[in-house]
């Protein structure tokens, strides 16, 4: 059996794996246990009451968190003409068509989000094998294929998170950094859960949001009692 590190021993002593914590208590616990030498992200796992094997019950989308994620995001946009100028004005680092595709084919991937106008998908379509495995392929369901590329760039820069359930029906994403004020982390979590509720598949039966856990990059998950969240979530 692997020997527990001192950090993991402390976490095991502090975190009761059988308990659902009030959100404020959960955040305080994460902050106390975040001892890494960098500012850890606060991640969330949401167990949904869906059958992930059925395509009509899969949940996918995007939402802008009110306080952002604390990350600086580099955006690449496939578009042309007036849209290209609008994308640059909105803060996109890379804008182009075939020239941008050529850079990507060469392995130049200095960006975190890819956005495309519908007319550019003929170019982006060639890059599926490169962008797809990295989760970067533009998709209208998450607002990254859109005629309004400037707004999409602004959303990405403002702290938009994209979400998609895994094969077990769990959503994994981030809600900020551990040095955020507790209120901001709480409001970001609530905004995400409201977005997930709006995205509930009509075919999903029973309890939809079954479990919510938050953790830091290097820490253990802490289950959150949903009763302590705002009425808009419950």
Curated annotation (Swiss-Prot):
Q: Share an example GO biological-process annotation for this protein.
A: cytoplasmic translation
Q: What is this protein called?
A: Large ribosomal subunit protein uL1
One cellular component term (GO) for this entry is: cytoplasm
Q: Does the keyword Zinc apply?
A: no
Signal sequence coordinates? none
Q: Which family does the record assign?
A: Belongs to the universal ribosomal protein uL1 family.
Question: What Pfam families does UniProt report for this protein, alphabetically?
Answer: Ribosomal_L1 (PF00687)
Origin organism of this chain? Escherichia coli (strain K12)
Tell me the InterPro entries matching this sequence. Ribosom_uL1_bac-type, Ribosomal_uL1, Ribosomal_uL1-like, Ribosomal_uL1/biogenesis, Ribosomal_uL1_3-a/b-sand, Ribosomal_uL1_CS
Q: Which UniProt keywords apply?
A: Repressor, Ribonucleoprotein, Ribosomal protein, RNA-binding, rRNA-binding, Translation regulation, tRNA-binding
């Amino acid at each position: 059996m692997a020997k527990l590190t001192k950090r993991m021993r402390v976490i095991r002593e502090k975190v009761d794996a059988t308990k659902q914590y009030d959100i404020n208590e959960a955040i305080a616990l994460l902050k106390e246990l975040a001892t890494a030498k960098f500012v850890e992200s606060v991640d969330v796992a949401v167990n949904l009451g869906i059958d992930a094997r059925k395509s009509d019950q899969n949940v996918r989308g995007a939402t802008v968190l009110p306080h952002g994620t604390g990350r600086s995001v580099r955006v690449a946009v496939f578009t042309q003409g007036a849209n290209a100028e609008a994308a640059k004005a909105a803060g996109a680092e890379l804008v182009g068509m075939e020239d941008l595709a050529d850079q990507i084919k060469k392995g130049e991937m200095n960006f975190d989000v890819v956005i495309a106008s519908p007319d550019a998908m003929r170019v982006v379509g060639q890059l599926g094998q490169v962008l797809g495995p990295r989760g970067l392929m533009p998709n209208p369901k998450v607002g990254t294929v859109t005629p309004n590329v400037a707004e999409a760039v602004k959303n990405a820069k403002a702290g938009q998170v994209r979400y998609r359930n895994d094969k077990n029906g769990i959503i994994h994403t981030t809600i900020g950094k551990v040095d955020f004020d507790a209120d901001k982390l709480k409001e970001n979590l609530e905004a995400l859960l409201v977005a997930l509720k709006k995205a509930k598949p009509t075919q999903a039966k029973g309890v939809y949001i079954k479990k919510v856990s938050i953790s830091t990059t290097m820490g253990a998950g802490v289950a959150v009692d949903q009763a302590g969240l705002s009425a808009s979530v419950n």
